[in-house]
Amino acid sequence: MSNTIFPGNTLGIIGINRNGVAMIAAAKKAGFNVGVYVDHSQPEITKMADFTIDGAYNDKQKLTEFGEACDAIIYQTPNIDSTVIRFLGQYAAIPQGINGLEIVQDRLMERAFLDQININIAPYVTVIGLDDVYQSIDSIGYPALLKPIQRGIGEQSMMIKRQSNITRAADFIDTGTYLLESWIDHTAEYTLTAACANGEVEIFPLAQLEYNEDRQLISVASPAEVADDMLQEMHRIIKSVADSLQYTGVFSVNFYVTSTGTLYVKNIELGLTSIANVYDNTTNVDQYEQQLRASVGMPLHVIRQLQTALLMIIRNYQAVAIRRQWLLKNNWKFRFFNNKDKDDPAGILGFVWVTGDTDLNALQNQVDDTEVWNKTLPNSESDNEEQEK
């Protein structure tokens, strides 16, 4: 099927989350009809779509109805089983392809892929039970992360800091194969996001991430500053991934940097991310328009940096404190969500883009002075996007 579609045609979106509102808006602005497939009602996200089909991901009748109503279908996140996307491919074009999705959904395949293109990753072994963990931990070292091979909604990793922790893995390990991976002690985390289509690769400016101890995202800073040779290596890596993954659209590569300056690739993420929302107010084109252009056969925009920004994550428990900044800050831009998880104190309420200075340290000082983000975040069970990948 042709991956070229034109205004007036129908673009389907599956695997939607809070970023879906912006993706639907981008497609509608460009003149496309938009259909959405969800496995549970999300009217706060899908109300802008021309039609919504609510059905299980194994409901072939509903999937067929959706596929036949669309000219092309994209997955917004990689949390949709590749067999579902392959089934939909009988009825509509799948511009992003399936190969990349199958690779990133399987941690072992992803690491084999990264090894094949000579990219530095953490040491790992595969395990299927406690005996394997005991036998392998000496070669991996402490601390280590135990992760299911298959990525998916709701799955988590387990940190093993000492031998006494291994017994707890009996409750964690179910059936199937797991990955035991060295935890890389790092001083910084970065994300590089790119769009690729028809041999073109356009790379967004580097972003630096800040997490709390519970791996909840606090802020995204862009453009992040690193040594020129490290930035060149990051660009080489993301271009190598783009050239080899057989994927069309927006994707990200996440990095660790150690205290000695060693660069490790953490993982590959396909589709749209909350992290890349920083570009909504820092570059001439955002991730949503680039995803749309790649998906419908248009050439990619050449990306240009326009300004420096901090993207701050607003949690529900910060709702009262952020209201004062809403009234005071003329250089802050806000986006709030109609939250279904508003009863979770650590659920994401919205984003703030802090701009107005070319110095990220000055922007951070401005944020620190408000004391909105100085409190310890409550534990959250609702936000799978932030879990260790």
Task: State each model region's role.
Residues 105-190, 195-244, 365-367:
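Active-site nucleotide/adenylate-binding loops and adjacent lid/helix of ATP-dependent enzymes
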Residues 173-225, 232-264, 269-276, 293-302, ...:
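Phosphate-binding core of ATP-grasp and ATP-grasp-like enzymes
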Residues 35, 74, 94-96, 122, ...:
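Structural detector of well-ordered beta-strand residues that form the stable sheet scaffold
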Residues 47, 118-120, 150-154, 306, ...:
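Short glycine-enriched loop/turn motifs at secondary-structure junctions
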Residues 1-105:
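ATP-binding N-terminal substructure of ATP-dependent carboxylate-amine bond-forming enzymes
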Residues 279-281:
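A conserved FAD-binding loop/helix module that cradles the flavin
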Residues 6-7, 293-389:
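Peripheral (often C-terminal) accessory segments that flank ATP-dependent C-N-forming ligase machineries
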